[in-house]
Swiss-Prot record:
This is Short-chain dehydrogenase/reductase GME11359. Its EC number is 1.1.1.-. The active site is at Y177 (proton acceptor), K181 (lowers pka of active site tyr). Pfam families: adh_short. It comes from Pestalotiopsis microspora.
Length: 291
């Protein structure tokens, strides 16, 4: 089968919120895109995209089953994705899925980890492992949706991650979100090291976005009315899309964080994440994940 013209994007967390809006904005462009989207609720996600006005002769949207809270669904999704790609390049791996939820109750599907950690980091790290050969062969760009909250993490917090991120640790949603997003950022560094020059890995913040549904699992919803820098979903998506094709990437391989206002954070902002042994600790091998 001949390769598809245009860019091919594999996306997580694109059934609603920022991910959905990002895909929607790209579907309005004249450049062809082929999307492969992982979603837990196929029917609802398909219905949402059916409402988007786009040229189906120019773009394609395929929705495949993926429940990031269940590691067992990741490998079948990766296999179906590779089959769907066939000879096409994987131009962009868009890792957008995220949740804000307290670590209460037992881990899902027998996991020792809380659901938010599995969704925010472990499952998407595993997916990247499974797609690694294709990423290298395609010279892909891996776009990790991060958060400016990573700079609030302290050394004492990192030392407590093993406890905080365990299932039923009792840690509240905000503590779990800070920890899991920091670990996710460690993963971005780790993948930048592992993939080297064969692929590009970036982390990008959408800013403080309102109306995404990220905090729907929280018992108490934060009041953002007093925060002047909050942004809408469409503006947050524009910030994310900047990472898809920006060409001003710093030469320093550790300077990978693109802010919502389009600047690259200096490394001293996130110096704690530069510890390679810490990156290794939180980025298990495919074999360890499957054990």
């Amino acid at each position: 089968m001949a390769a598809t013209l245009g860019k091919t994007i594999v996306a997580t967390g694109a059934s609603s919120g920022l991910g959905f809006e990002s895909v929607k904005q790209l579907l309005q462009q004249s450049q062809p895109y082929k999307f492969i989207i992982g979603a837990r609720d196929l029917k609802t996600t398909q219905a949402a995209f059916d409402q988007v006005q786009y040229d189906a002769k120019t773009h394609s949207v395929s929705i495949l089953p993926l429940d990031l809270a269940d590691l067992r669904t990741v490998k079948p999704f990766a296999q179906q994705t590779l089959e769907a790609l066939d000879q096409d390049k994987l131009d962009i791996l868009f890792l957008n899925a995220g949740m804000n939820k307290a670590a209460t109750g037992p881990g899902l599907h027998g996991s020792k980890w809380c659901e938010a950690y599995v969704v925010n980091h472990l499952s998407q790290h595993y997916l990247t492992q499974l797609l690694r050969p294709k990423l290298s062969a395609s010279h892909s760009r891996v776009v990790v949706v991060s958060s400016g909250l990573i700079r609030a993490v302290k050394e004492a917090d990192i030392e407590a991650f093993e406890t905080t991120l365990k299932a039923d640790s009792g840690a509240d949603g905000f503590k779990v979100y800070h920890a899991s997003k920091f670990v996710q950022f460690l993963g971005a560094h780790w993948w930048r090291r592992q993939l080297g020059t064969s692929a590009t890995v970036l982390a990008v913040s959408p800013g403080l976005v309102i109306g995404t549904g990220l905090g729907r699992h929280l018992d108490t919803q934060p009041n953002l009315d007093h925060i002047p820098d909050k942004v809408t979903v469409d503006k947050g998506a524009k910030s994310l899309l900047r990472a898809f094709d920006c060409n001003d990437i710093p030469e320093d391989p550790e300077q990978i964080f693109l802010t919502s206002w389009g600047e690259w954070w200096p490394k001293d902002v996130y110096s704690l994440s530069l510890d390679k042994s810490l990156q290794d600790r939180w980025c298990p091998s495919q074999e360890d994940i499957e054990a």
